[in-house]
Amino acid sequence: MDSLSPKRAAVLAFLQQQAQAGLAPSLAEIAQAFGFASRNAAQKHVQALAEAGLIELVPNRKRGIRVPGGAGPDALLALPVLGRVAAGVPIGADIGLDRQLWLDRSLFALRPDYLLQVQGDSMIDDGILEGDLVGVQRSSDARNGQIVVARVDGEITIKRLERSADAIRLLPRNPAHAPIVVAADADFAIEGVYCGLIRQG
């Protein structure tokens, strides 16, 4: 499986877990589970897995995918996409269940609880680009220097945390953006810590 892309490995793990549960998902169900725009994208991954000998396809059957092995219970994560997070000027809270994606656990350094879609370019020097989906682990605390998702006066942003004796600053990773200095009377909370990202497309 070393030669598989992260997305293709996640599709294989999904099929293995479904097989363990006695299920054989259709292409439409695979596309829905991974947020693919069409059945064709699911077909591409399934066909590649079959050509690699990792699954078997039974001709002329809607649910004709056979999987020889099974995945461990922690190989896949079902993560909700809960809206957008600003990598730039903070944006108003846009938290609500958008969709759910199945992702390979190995994509993330920490185990995330949910995903947010990045809007803006303030974190590009950390490799976080507009449109990326970032994994977030719920936490009300973080270490100095960690990338956090923070709420400032009702708005949400992703930045590096810098705490000193007299101030909290949220640091961008793009010289075109200024740090956010959190006022003493601001409604400030750390919502979670950054776990990693996936780039769609």
UniProtKB/Swiss-Prot annotation:
Top EC group: hydrolase
One BP term from GO: negative regulation of DNA-templated transcription
Role noted for this protein: Represses a number of genes involved in the response to DNA damage (SOS response), including recA and lexA. In the presence of single-stranded DNA, RecA interacts with LexA causing an autocatalytic cleavage which disrupts the DNA-binding part of LexA, leading to derepression of the SOS regulon and eventually DNA repair.
Keyword Repeat part of the UniProt annotation: no
InterPro entries: LexA, LexA-like, LexA/Signal_pep-like_sf, LexA_DNA-bd_dom, LexA_repressor, Peptidase_S24_LexA, Peptidase_S24_S26A/B/C, WH-like_DNA-bd_sf
Homology family: Belongs to the peptidase S24 family.
Keyword field contains Disulfide bond: no
Reaction catalysed by this enzyme: Hydrolysis of Ala-|-Gly bond in repressor LexA
Name assigned to this protein: LexA repressor 1
Record-listed E.C. numbers: 3.4.21.88
HAMAP family named among the record's database cross-references: LexA
Site positions (Cleavage): A87, G88
Catalytic site: S122 (for autocatalytic cleavage activity), K159 (for autocatalytic cleavage activity)
Coiled coil: none
DNA-binding residues (ranges): 27-47
Domain of life: Bacteria
